[in-house]
Swiss-Prot record:
CDD domains: RNAP_beta'_C, RNAP_beta'_N. The gene is rpoC. Zn(2+) 2 binds at C825, C899, C906, C909. InterPro entries: DNA-dir_RpoC_beta_prime, DNA-dir_RpoC_beta_prime_bact, RNA_pol_asu, RNA_pol_N, RNA_pol_Rpb1_1, RNA_pol_Rpb1_3, RNA_pol_Rpb1_3_sf, RNA_pol_Rpb1_4. One of its GO terms (molecular function) is DNA binding. This is DNA-directed RNA polymerase subunit beta'. The keyword Hydrolase does not apply. The RNAP catalytic core consists of 2 alpha, 1 beta, 1 beta' and 1 omega subunit. When a sigma factor is associated with the core the holoenzyme is formed, which can initiate transcription. Binds 1 Mg(2+) ion per subunit. Gene3D superfamilies: 1.10.132.30, 1.10.150.390, 1.10.1790.20, 1.10.40.90, 2.40.40.20, 2.40.50.100, RNA polymerase II, clamp domain, RNA polymerase Rpb1, domain 3. PANTHER family: DNA-DIRECTED RNA POLYMERASE, DNA-DIRECTED RNA POLYMERASE SUBUNIT BETA.
Length: 1404
């Protein structure tokens, strides 16, 4: 009986594996997979529809077409299982094996595998050290290659043309052998001695001095080492046997009408077989060489197309002129195997429908249409029906359900109770795009969604659709309930703020409810408690907005367990609406939080306070109650838009006339030649922008206040001076914008102010504005101008979405394997956090930056010296507030950047899980969360910041810095200055800053002070707000002397290096240095105009401490302001360089800027940083470049070649610090890493990315950016291999080097040294250790080619790899599953030896 039952068991192979290895298949291996050789190109017999024997679908090779039935029908049924029919040779078994069994084709002539040939860098070329061009000539029969030179002067691997070959054969006879085609290449590979090649290459790397040689040798060495280590042979890159895919994977499907649809692969295989058979026949017939060669070339081409069509030459096309889909095309790209079937699967038990709003739902509920629920929960219903005895079989149960028996609905209710379902809205940009809800059955066909979760899903009800998924197993239901239920996702993982925040109608209702109206009915009444107010309000004795006095019970959180909360009763002056809201406040929230007009921001703060003070459960209930109140009072308020709400200000015509008058004057100035065309345009745009702002201000002033009317008489109230009493306006449009429900001041301005200036699609501004608004209506010209700019917006949106999605994909890919895997890595590293100050404003407080981090050292109160919190403490709200209050300046906190966990992160370095508000759990996939948090707001970023010709960026060039607050001045350590004759302090440092500290020594502001500025304050001086700290000339850059003495010019020759220019207006003559390219006299090209200083005895003044004379070079374009022989004092200006301000560089902003930072691209026209601390000098110029030399303290010179048109900010004899900017321009992040270290790099990337997001009002925690930077830095470059197996200059995972070094140190050998390399996110994803993950990301062919040559092993550490092989991911609940599995395996581990394991593998 048992044996019988075994028959019905599925043939399942449960293989436990820890890693997947990829490599080259040897011909023997291919034959061992195969069940027979495919000899004919035939597929199936067109009459009988049976597969042809020995053909591509042969049943003898691949297995039976029908289950347990041979082809001729002699053996049918299960009892003959395993019999091989003697008539047709088919094994009687399941037809499913046609998906698994492979065949093979014996090739008549070897063929090169196109991937190893053409995928750059060509692996064949690397192994043989022959160029790809030459190999192709051999393979495609254009040249001979010498395989064995014998005693002749030829060399191995030399190419011979047809003529050469004939000549050499005449000359040497049979002393040498040469061959053509893949045979020649194979012979070379076969005869190669890998070990001796490796030896000679290692020697070459040590001895040679040439960089390129070392690079090339290292590349070859890497490939050969891999072959040596993996035990694969290079000649396997040439195919002699071709595997044939199982037929079910390349099916032939009959269509109606006797035609067939076939997979392209069959076509490609048929071509290979046809050519191969023809070649065999030609060889048997001893055909002429030229015919055979042609046939061999065609065979090579057909195998190329089969493996990767279109990689070389023209792609093979089918009958319909469409390129055929080859094996490589099957796996790569969006529609390939990886991304289509392995990473994105369609799932069962799911449905989708349109969503509608469900305002009556609780936060954890969703409305599910009965029809849908019935279909989704069918199996559960069948089971219940059977258990209850309503149906005896599944079939009967099915019938009951189809007939919609009334009992089915009762069962459905029961089945659905407490069985959560998951709702998902595409695109799922972050983890809140899928949440679990408890279904509530509803009539109709649309899913009902709770309004408060719309923000997380980014859903609206204009026709959006959502998908429903049913978690089946108990574990899945449990995870849904504990991790995914919407009530457990109140906070946004991106920044830790609540994401369940009321919006639109709800905000409007709550705002209306909490506004105060002067003279409303019932004003000034006094009530004993809120229920009394409710009665009065219901009976219409009170208005909602009336000001009243009432006693309100405030409940503090209870101290003990089971005690009632402590109540305090306080008397408040408040309004009716606010008192009503106090009823729904949870215990522990003070009434003061709602005793104000509730706008959107305030409501957000309210929910945040509730979460922190009262916990999750109370907050969710509170949010629901807020929603119900908001909707209810928005309905009662009846706020709507009417035309009279759009008030056009009376001053508008006057403002416009004044602007037109100004423009008329400027036009006249332009005509008389006083201003240029560009200046005129800029001024016009400025005037209109200002006029628009004035109109908008007048409009908002008029909108936002209204006179108070008496309730009975309807007359306007006046105060004792006869002035009208005013109050904040109850204008509907104003209320909508003010509350934050919908619209903004900018939109109201277009409705009832003036539309203002419009932009063209290229971002430039049209100088004639639209003076009308929408209330007045536009004329045809105005309408045309406005459509012009609006279209651009639509086009941009479409581009933006695609780009943003691609950025997210790259970010996820680079961080997908970063998971919290231990609690504490024990590092003492960290970064120092300060408040972020820009200009005079605190952009982000210290509290905000350290909240949710772990302190890396004890935080000490600077005044008392006591410890506020000890090392290793998670800084929560209270601690952070305390630190802020104690005026601590900086806190060292742990960071993902310095975490020492090898493959992952530790919980301490990460800190708080922002989405839960608790310390992060082991198993949290923080990498993916970081990627989503940065990618998700990407769609809100702009594609580019327009250099708005004055309109938006009308910030005038600053010419002074003034303090915003009182405090004490502190100079930054970079500042260097000299005192001039007038006793003014002149700055001579490049990156000087002035800090202003408050009385506790806490940094309040930070101002950059440029070179040449005059300082107006001393270090340590106490100043008032508004005091000027420093001033400078904005449009000219001075060259300032640090020495006094008599000037001597050198190489300053009029007409040679300088020209005399006479100013047209002032008539003064000045000397201007001319560009060497434009100098007409040949010998003047190398001359640099410079100035030296002489003392009283006419001796040259030297740089202090050296015998080098002081010399200051004048740059191109400098206007020299001193005369030869003039006496100058310290701090005087020698020359001025005019700065071009009009040429606004189009700064990449928005999304492209974020992508540029994460891709670590070298910016165009990058600035130069000083490589060392030392003295600057200029060397001899080369053509078009100037040479700058920095001599460091040890006397070592560092040279730079800098393009002539670049502005060097340093001058001769100046001392610069390592990492300081010496040539203006955007900074290259690679330089920051090299010169300033990891921390400075992280700070740079963090600040730059945050700038872009902050501009759009998106807040993202720094942690997420640090996580990404950590992944960009995960590879290191070997600077010295020591005794390790690494190669000099090789890039490896840092974890790998650390492990190897530990091993070497225990063996008392020399460890390898390395330096960090910064990789962009795309490169970092592709260079990951996991080839499965890299192949599914981009450049699949290249990744797989490289991995198979290297014989790579994928340890399946990341999330993607595990999804692809179909396992639970090693994150969250899956992490413990994997850990337990591994432990069990280790306890049972016995070593099994497989017959075809190579000796190397056994030895390992």
């Amino acid at each position: 009986m048992k044996a019988l039952l075994d028959l019905f068991k599925q043939v399942t192979q449960k293989e436990e594996f820890d890693s997947i290895k990829i490599g080259l298949a040897s011909p023997e291996k291919i034959r061992s997979w195969s069940y027979g050789e495919v000899k004919k190109p035939e597929t199936i017999n067109y009459r009988t529809f049976k597969p042809e024997r020995d053909g591509l679908f042969c049943a003898k090779i691949f297995g039976p077409v029908k289950d347990y039935e041979c082809l001729c029908g002699k053996y049918k049924r299960l009892k003959h299982r395993g019999v091989i029919c003697e008539k047709c040779g088919v094994e009687v078994t399941l037809s499913r094996i046609r998906r698994e069994r492979m065949g093979h084709i014996e090739l008549a002539s070897p063929v090169a595998h196109i991937w190893f040939l053409k995928s750059l860098p060509s692996r064949l070329g690397l192994v043989l050290d022959i160029t790809l061009r030459d190999i192709e000539r051999v393979l495609y029969f254009e040249a001979y290659i010498v395989t064995d030179p014998g005693m002749t002067p030829l060399t191995r691997g030399q190419l011979l043309t047809e003529d050469d070959y004939l000549n050499k054969t005449e000359e040497f006879g049979d002393d040498f052998s040469a061959a053509m085609g893949a045979e020649g290449i194979r012979a070379l590979l076969n005869s190669m001695d890998i070990l001796s090649e490796i030896e000679s290459l290692r020697l070459e790397i040590q001895t040679t001095g040439s960089e390129t040689k070392i690079k090339k040798a290292a590349k070859r060495l890497k490939v050969l080492e891999a072959f040596n280590k993996s035990g694969m042979k290079p000649e396997w890159m040439i195919l002699t046997v071709l595997p044939v895919l199982p037929p079910e994977l390349r099916p032939l499907v009959p269509l109606d009408g006797g035609r067939f649809a076939t997979s392209d692969l069959n076509d490609l295989y048929r071509r290979v077989i046809n050519r191969n058979n023809r070649l065999k026949r030609l060889l048997e017939l001893r055909a002429p060489e030229i015919i055979i060669r042609n046939e061999k070339r065609m065979l090579q081409e057909s195998v190329d197309s089969l493996l990767d069509n279109g990689r070389r030459g023209k792609a093979m096309t089918g009958a319909n002129k469409r390129p055929l889909k080859s094996l490589a095309d099957m796996i790569k790209g969006k529609g390939g195997r990886f991304r289509q079937n392995l990473l994105g699967k369609r799932v069962d038990y799911s449905g989708r429908s349109v969503i509608v709003v469900g305002p009556q739902l609780k936060l954890h509920q969703c409305g599910l249409p009965k029809k849908m629920a019935l279909e989704l929960f069918k199996p559960f219903i069948f089971n219940k029906l059977e258990v209850m005895g309503v149906a005896s079989t599944i079939k009967a149960a099915k019938r009951e359900v189809e007939n919609e028996n009334p009992i089915v609905w009762d069962i459905l209710e029961e089945v659905i109770r407490e069985h959560p379902v998951m709702l998902n809205r595409a695109p799922t940009l972050h983890r809140l795009g899928i949440q679990a809800f408890e279904p509530v059955l509803i009539e109709g066909k649309a899913i009902q969604l709770h309004p408060l979760v719309c923000a997380a899903f980014n859903a609206d009800f204009d026709g959006d659709q959502m998908a429903v998924h049913v978690p089946l197993s108990l574990e899945a239901q449990m995870e849904c309930r504990t991790l995914m239920l919407s009530t457990n996702n109140v906070l946004s993982p991106a920044n830790g703020d609540p994401i369940i925040v009321p919006s639109q109608d709800i905000v409007l209702g709550l705002y209306y409810m909490t506004r105060e109206k002067v003279g409303a009915q019932g004003e000034g009444m006094v009530f004993s408690d809120v229920s009394e107010i409710t009665r009065a309000y219901e009976s219409k004795a009170l208005e909602l907005n009336a000001r009243i006095t009432v006693r309100i019970k405030e409940k503090k959180k209870s101290c003990g367990h089971g005690e009632d909360p402590i109540e305090t009763i306080t008397r408040f002056e408040t309004t009716v609406g606010r008192a009503l809201i106090s009823e729904i406040l949870p215990a522990g929230l003070p009434f003061a939080l709602v005793n104000k007009t509730l706008k959107k921001k305030e409501i957000s703060k309210l929910i945040n306070a509730s979460f922190r003070l009262c916990g999750l459960r109370e907050t969710v209930i509170f949010a629901d109650k807020l929603m119900y109140s908001g909707f209810s009072y928005a309905t009662r308020g009846g706020i709507s838009i009417c035309l009279d709400d759009l008030v056009t200000p009376s001053q508008k015509t006057g403002i416009i006339q004044a602007a037109e008058q100004e423009i008329h004057e400027i036009a006249n100035q332009y005509i008389s030649g006083l201003v240029t065309q560009g200046e005129r345009y800029n001024k016009v745009v400025d005037i209109w922008a200002r006029a628009g702002d004035q109109v908008a201000k007048a409009m908002m002033d008029q909108l936002s206040v209204e006179p108070v009317k008496d309730q009975e008489t309807g007359e306007i109230r006046t105060d004792k001076n006869g002035q009208a009493v005013t109050q904040e306006s109850f204008n509907s449009i104003y209320m909508m914008a003010d509350s934050g429900a919908r619209g903004s001041a900018a939109q109201i301005r277009q409705l009832s102010g003036m539309r203002g200036l419009m932009a063209k699609p290229d971002g430039s501004i049209i100088e004639t504005p639209i003076t009308a608004n929408f209330r007045e209506g536009l004329n045809i010209l105005q309408y045309f101008i406005s459509t012009h700019g609006a279209r651009k917006g639509l086009a941009d949106t479409a581009l933006k979405t695609a780009n943003s999605g691609y950025l997210t994909r790259r970010l996820v890919d680079v961080t997908q394997d970063l998971v919290i895997i231990e609690n504490d890595c024990g590092t003492d590293g960290g970064v120092v956090m300060k408040a972020l100050v820009e200009g005079g404003n605190v952009v982000e407080s210290l509290r905000g930056r350290i909240l949710g981090r772990v302190a890396a050292t004890d935080v000490i109160n600077p005044e008392t010296g006591e410890v506020i919190c000890s090392e290793g403490t998670l800084l929560d709200e209270d601690t952070a507030d305390e630190i802020e209050a104690c005026s601590v300046d900086e806190v060292k906190v742990r960071t993902p950047l310095t975490c020492e966990t090898r493959y992952g992160l530790c919980a301490k370095c990460y800190g708080r899980d922002l989405g839960r508000g608790t310390p992060v759990n082991v198993g949290e996939a923080v990498g993916v969360i970081a990627a989503q948090s940065i990618g998700e707001p990407g769609t809100q970023l702009t594609m580019r910041t327009f250099h708005i010709g004055g309109a938006a960026s009308r910030a005038v060039v600053a010419n002074q810095a003034e303090s915003k607050s009182n405090g004490v001045v502190r100079y930054s350590h970079h500042i260097r200055y000299v005192k001039n004759a007038q006793n003014e302090l002149i700055i001579i440092s490049r990156s000087g800053e002035i800090l202003i500290q408050d009385e506790n020594g806490r940094e309040r502001e930070r101002h950059k002070i440029p070179y040449g500025a005059t300082l107006h304050v001393q270090d340590g001086e106490t100043i008032k707000a508004g005091q000027i700290l420093g001033s400078w000339e904005p449009h000219k850059r001075p060259i300032i002397t640090e020495y006094a003495g008599k000037i001597r010019f050198e190489n300053v020759e009029e007409g040679v290096t300088v020209v005399r220019q006479i100013d047209e207006i002032t008539g003064m003559a000045t000397l201007v240095v001319i560009d060497p390219k434009r100098r007409n006299i040949a010998q003047s090209k190398g001359l640099r105009p410079l100035v030296k200083f002489l003392d009283e005895n006419d001796q040259e003044i030297n740089i202090p401490g050296t015998d080098q004379p002081v010399s200051i070079t004048f740059h191109v374009g400098s206007i020299i302001t001193v005369r030869d022989g003039q006496q100058v004092g310290i701090g005087e200006v020698l020359a001025r360089i005019p700065q071009e301000t009009s040429k606004t560089r189009d700064i990449t902003g928005g999304l492209p800027r974020v992508a540029e930072l994460f891709e670590a691209r070298v910016p165009k026209d990058a600035g130069f940083l000083a490589e060392a601390t030392g003295t600057v000098a200029f060397g001899k110029d080369t053509k078009g470049k100037q040479r700058l030399v920095i001599t460091d303290l040890d006397g070592i010179a560092h040279e730079y070649l800098i393009p002539k048109d670049k502005h060097v900010t340093a001058h001769d004899g100046q001392v610069v610090n390592k990492g300081e900017v010496i040539v203006d321009g955007p900074i290259d992040p690679h330089d920051i890493l090299r010169l300033q270290g990891v921390e400075a790099l992280a700070k740079y990337i963090s600040d730059e990315v945050q700038d872009v997001y902050r501009l759009q009002g998106v807040s993202i925690n720094d942690k997420h950016i640090e996580v990404i930077v950590r992944q960009m830095l995960r590879r290191v470059q070997i600077t010295n291999a020591g005794d390790s197996a690494f190669i000099l200059g090789e890039q490896v995972e840092r974890a790998e080097v650390l492990a190897e070094n530990e091993k070497l140190i225990t063996e008392n050998k020399m460890p390898a040294t390395y330096e960090y390399v910064l990789l962009g996110i795309t490169k970092a994803s592709l260079s990951t250790d996991s080839f499965i993950s890299a192949a599914s990301f981009q450049e699949t062919t290249r990744v797989l080619t490289e991995a198979s040559i290297m014989g790579k092993k994928d340890d399946l550490r990341g999330l993607k790899e595990n999804v692809i092989v179909g396992r639970l991911i090693p994150a969250g609940t899956g992490l413990s599953f994997h850990n337990i599995r591994k432990k069990q395996r280790l306890s049972e581990s016995t070593v099994y030896l497989d017959a075809d394991l190579t000796e190397n593998e056994i030895a390992e």
